[in-house]
Amino acid sequence: MTSKIQNPNLAALSAAGVSVWLDDLSRDRLQSGNLQKLIDTKSVVGVTTNPSIFQKAFANGHAYDAQIAELAKRGANVDVTVRTVTTDDVRHACDVLACEWEASHGKDGRVSIEVDPRLAHDTDKTIAQAVELWRIVDHPNLFIKIPATKAGLPAITAVLAEGISVNVTLIFSVQRHREVIDAYLAGIEKAAEAGRDLSKIVSVASFFVSRVDTEIDKRLEKLGSEQALALRGQAGVANARLAYAAYQKAFEGGQRYQTLMARGAQVQRPLWASTGVKNPDYADTLYVTELVAPNTVNTMPETTIDAVADHGVIRGDTISGTTLSSQKVFDSLVAVGVDLIDVFAVLEHEGVQKFVKSWNELLKETQEQLDSVAK
């Protein structure tokens, strides 16, 4: 029986209004009881997955071999095999997190599964697959992850209108975050027109943090001036803080949301993603301790959860009151010559391509396993 004594640092983070989610899932993690242990001792109340996470899970060890062999004997093709295996893991994780879902009235206890990343620029196919995944997993604490591409935005609205909960992923800019909020509100308005229970439709907006620093720092180093170099390591946090200000404007003061709230609609919480620190010169808890505010989620790899548990200093709300200083960071970036429009375009393109590459590798490796069973 796992002890249910929560780590004090992570408990403090939760008490400050930040839901701690694990950015990882594998069958080994489920079967070993590790996910349950993280729930019981590290305040974890949700799970996010993506194509890269599943590709690594399949590649490491043999936890999936027996199921893939069984599917091969039944004549399943590679797409069906991958979808069956991944949705089984997600369904199992939904069961593990059911208590957290109930205790939070549906806000937490969520498990995210992403639509095929190859559909990132196809609205209709994204909608169709989102509906299919929702049907296959068939758990109310599921999130369907849809990327915040231009084609993804109308898909988000359409899927929410069907009463399906959505995790919007690959958001890099505050402007795109505003468009995501609009897509969410439009979807909830359509759901209201259809007579759906708005309190049951939940969404988060996954705003990527460390990748912004990685891309902008690279450009600052290329520029090389003293002013440029002094700005390294500031953009990721400042960008996320400005995204939180956009959230506050829409949901804490926006009339459009107030009308929907009266009918039971929930806010679309910002979720800080890509919070594992990639630069060893920066504190390994940077994207956690500097992004504390009510009604947020931080999804972290286990190494980051462990770092916060060990030495993360939670100082309460570190976002409120930072809008002007955060905007100043971006004004300074423009002043030294950083092309922010290009930065965010590159990040979105690379984000989609990384997931496509992982998905293709997953399909290739699974096809090889299917072929070996057939021989």
UniProtKB/Swiss-Prot annotation:
Pfam family for this entry, one: TAL_FSA
Family matches, as InterPro entries: Aldolase_TIM, TAL/FSA, Transaldolase_2, Transaldolase_AS
Membrane-crossing segments per the record: none
SUPFAM superfamilies tied to this protein: Aldolase (SSF51569)
Sorted UniProt keywords: Cytoplasm, Pentose shunt, Schiff base, Transferase
Catalytic activities: D-sedoheptulose 7-phosphate + D-glyceraldehyde 3-phosphate = D-erythrose 4-phosphate + beta-D-fructose 6-phosphate
GO molecular function: transaldolase activity
Compartments it resides in: Cytoplasm
Gene Ontology terms: cellular component: cytoplasm
Pathway terms, separated by semicolons: Carbohydrate degradation; pentose phosphate pathway; D-glyceraldehyde 3-phosphate and beta-D-fructose 6-phosphate from D-ribose 5-phosphate and D-xylulose 5-phosphate (non-oxidative stage): step 2/3
This enzyme's EC code(s): 2.2.1.2
Entry-linked Gene3D superfamilies: Aldolase class I (3.20.20.70)
Entry annotation: catalytic residues: K145
Gene Ontology biological process terms, A to Z: carbohydrate metabolic process; pentose-phosphate shunt
Family the UniProt entry places it in: Belongs to the transaldolase family. Type 2 subfamily.
Function: Transaldolase is important for the balance of metabolites in the pentose-phosphate pathway.
NCBIfam families attached to this UniProt entry: PRK03343.1, tal_mycobact
Full protein name: Transaldolase
